[in-house]
Amino acid sequence: MAFPEKLKALRLENGLTQDELGEKLYLSRASISSYEIGRNEPTIETIIAISDLFKISIDELLK
């Protein structure tokens, strides 16, 4: 599963809206949306924050 699909799946599994995930990561809903559709890629800092939030390794997140 590619990163955009993985991010959306993790968000939905945890019962979060794009707005709620954005708040937890200090990002806008538009940023979350753009990651989920593959328009933009997050910074390494954001990848680390997502990994920490969902308690999964960066390797799991990106593979």
Feature map (PLM): residue ranges:
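Short hydrophobic/aromatic patches at helix-to-coil boundaries
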Residues: 2, 60-63
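Short basic helix-loop element that most often maps to the first helix and adjoining turn
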Residues: 5-24, 49
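Conserved hydrophobic/aromatic packing and binding residues within compact polymer-binding modules
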Residues: 7, 21-22, 32-35, 61
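Recognition helix of helix-turn-helix/homeodomain-like DNA-binding domains
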Residues: 26-41
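DNA major-groove recognition helix of helix-turn-helix/homeodomain DNA-binding modules
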Residues: 45-60
